[in-house]
Regions:
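A late C-terminal transmembrane helix in Major Facilitator Superfamily
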Residues: 353-380
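A membrane-interface helix-boundary motif in multi-pass transporters
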Residues: 155-168, 378-396
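Cytoplasmic helix-loop-helix junction between adjacent transmembrane helices
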Residues: 104-137
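Helix-loop boundary and gating motifs at the non-cytosolic
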Residues: 3-51, 234-236, 240, 249-258, ...
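Structural signature of the two symmetry-related core transmembrane helices
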Residues: 73-86, 167, 298-312
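Helix-to-loop junctions at the C-terminal end of transmembrane segments
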Residues: 57-69, 154, 283-295, 378
Length: 417
C-alpha cells in the first residue's frame, strides 16, 4: 500500500494533469474559432473525434498500465502529450492541429486510468470512499480553475500558451513521476504492476472483489440493501453518466459560439462559462459529507431533469445572468450523476473488472455521440437555428426514458396495507 506521502504525490499529479488537460482541450475550440474560423458545427466534429478516440483508448490505456506498470504508463502518457504540444506550437494548418489534438487525447488516456488506480491502490473500503471524495474534488477543483482563468491566460500570454503552458506542466509531471517511482522503489512499496494487489483503473476506483464483498459505505457489515435493488441503481447510474458526458462534451464544444453570441471576450468567457465546473465541485463536496442521496431515486431523477433543462437553457439563453444560474444548476446535476456512478460501482458487491471497462467505453461513446448528433443536425437542418440544441436535448430525453424504464421494471411492488 502506498503511504500518505506517495499518495499525496499522486494527487499532485492528478491536480496538475486536470489543470493542463482542461486548459488545452477546453480552449482548443476557442483556438480553432479564432485561428481558422471554426463555428459550432466544426467544433462539434472536433469534439466527436475526441470522444471517439477516448472510447477506444481509455480502457486500453488502463490495461497497458496493468501490464507494463503504473509509472511506465504515466511516463509514456506525459511524454506523448508534451511532445505533441511542443510540435503543435510550431504548426499552422487546421489539419495539423487536429492531428496534434488526437495524439494528445491518446496520451491522456494513459494517465487518467493509471492515476485512478494509484489513488485507490491498497485502500481499505472505508479509506477508499474517503479517497474517492478527495480524488473528485482535486480534479474537479483544478479543472474548474483552469477553465476559469484559461481565457485570461490566452489573452495575456498569447495564443501559443495553449501549447506551451500544458507542455511545461507535462514536462514537470514527467520529472515528478520519475522521482515518485524512485521513492516507491526505495521503500519497496511499488516496483512493478505485477507486484501490486490489483490495478483496476477502469473499475472507477472500486476495491477488489474480496475487499468489496459484504462491505457497504464506511461499515464492514453486509450490505443491507436487496441485491437486485442495488444493481438497479448501478445500472441507472451507468446509464445516466454517459448521457451526462453527452451534454458536457457538446456544451464545451459550442461555448465559443455562446461567448460570441453574448459578446464576451475570451477572458470573460472563461470567467462566465466555467461556472458549471464550480457547481459540479460544490456538488462533489456536499455529496462527500452527506449520504442522504444514497439509493434515493428522486435525487438521481431530479439531477437528470436539471441536466436536461439547463443544457438547453445554457445554449439559447439571451443574457448573462440566466447563463450563470443555469450553469450552477447544470453543474450540480452533473456532480450527483457522476458521483452516483462512482458510489454505486463501489457499493454493489459483484461489479467485475470487465464491467469497469464497459463503463469507460460507454462514457467515451457518450463523448462522441452528443457532439456527433449536434454536428449532424446543423449539417442537415441548417435552416433551423437551434437544430443542434433540439437534437441533443431529444437524445438526453431518450436517456430519461431509459432511466424511468429501469426504475419501473426493478422497483419492488407496492404492498397494500
Amino acid at each position: 500500500m502506498l503511504d500518505t506521502r506517495l499518495k499525496t504525490g499522486v494527487l499532485i499529479l492528478e491536480g496538475s494533469n486536470s489543470f493542463a488537460t482542461t486548459y488545452y482541450f477546453y480552449y482548443f475550440y476557442f483556438f480553432m474559432q479564432k485561428q481558422f474560423g471554426f463555428g459550432d458545427k466544426a467544433n462539434l466534429v472536433l469534439a466527436a473525434l475526441n470522444g471517439l478516440v477516448c472510447a477506444f483508448a481509455a480502457w486500453w490505456g488502463g490495461c497497458f498500465a496493468q501490464r507494463a506498470g503504473y509509472f511506465t504508463a504515466l511516463k509514456l502518457g506525459f511524454a506523448v502529450m508534451m511532445v505533441a504540444l511542443l510540435i503543435g506550437a510550431l504548426l499552422d494548418s487546421p489539419e495539423a492541429h487536429i492531428a496534434v489534438m488526437l495524439v494528445t487525447v491518446l496520451g491522456m488516456c494513459f494517465t487518467w486510468p493509471t492515476l485512478e488506480a494509484l489513488v485507490s491502490e491498497g485502500e481499505t473500503p472505508a479509506g477508499l470512499q474517503h479517497m474517492i471524495g478527495i480524488y473528485n474534488m482535486v480534479w474537479a477543483g483544478t479543472g474548474a480553475l483552469a477553465y476559469f482563468i484559461g481565457g485570461a491566460m490566452l489573452d495575456t500570454l498569447g495564443i501559443k500558451s495553449l501549447f506551451y503552458v500544458p507542455a511545461v506542466v507535462f514536462m514537470a509531471q514527467l520529472g515528478f513521476t520519475v522521482w515518485l517511482e524512485l521513492e516507491a522503489k526505495k521503500t519497496s512499496q511499488l516496483c512493478q504492476a505485477s507486484e501490486i494487489p490489483l490495478a483496476r483503473p477502469s473499475d472507477t476506483l472500486s476495491p477488489s472483489d474480496g475487499e468489496r464483498e459484504g462491505v457497504t459505505g464506511m461499515s464492514a457489515k453486509p450490505n443491507p440493501r436487496p441485491t437486485t435493488r442495488a444493481k438497479a441503481y448501478l445500472r441507472m447510474a451507468w446509464l445516466t453518466n454517459p448521457f451526462a458526458y453527452i451534454a458536457i462534451n457538446t456544451l464545451v464544444a459550442v461555448m465559443p459560439g455562446v461567448a460570441q453570441r453574448l459578446d464576451l471576450s475570451t477572458t470573460l468567457a472563461g470567467f462566465c462559462c466555467s461556472i458549471w465546473c464550480f457547481g459540479r465541485l460544490g456538488a462533489f463536496f456536499g455529496l462527500w459529507f452527506w449520504s442522504g442521496w444514497h439509493y434515493r431515486f428522486r435525487w438521481l431523477l431530479a439531477s437528470y431533469l436539471a441536466l436536461v433543462a439547463t443544457f438547453a437553457v445554457i445554449l439559447v439563453v439571451p443574457n448573462l445572468a440566466m447563463l450563470v444560474v443555469a450553469q450552477l444548476v447544470f453543474g450540480g446535476g452533473i456532480g450527483l450523476i457522476y458521483y452516483s456512478s462512482l458510489f454505486y460501482s463501489m457499493d454493489v458487491g459483484e461489479t467485475k473488472g470487465e464491467h469497469g471497462g464497459i463503463h469507460e467505453a460507454i462514457i467515451g461513446v457518450g463523448n462522441f455521440t452528443g457532439p456527433a448528433v449536434g454536428a449532424a443536425s446543423l449539417q442537415f437542418l441548417p435552416q433551423q437555428a437551434h437544430s443542434g440544441v433540439v437534437a441533443v436535448t431529444a437524445l438526453l430525453l431518450c436517456g430519461l426514458g431509459g432511466l424511468l424504464t429501469i426504475w419501473r421494471t426493478t422497483r419492488p411492488p407496492t404492498t397494500k396495507t
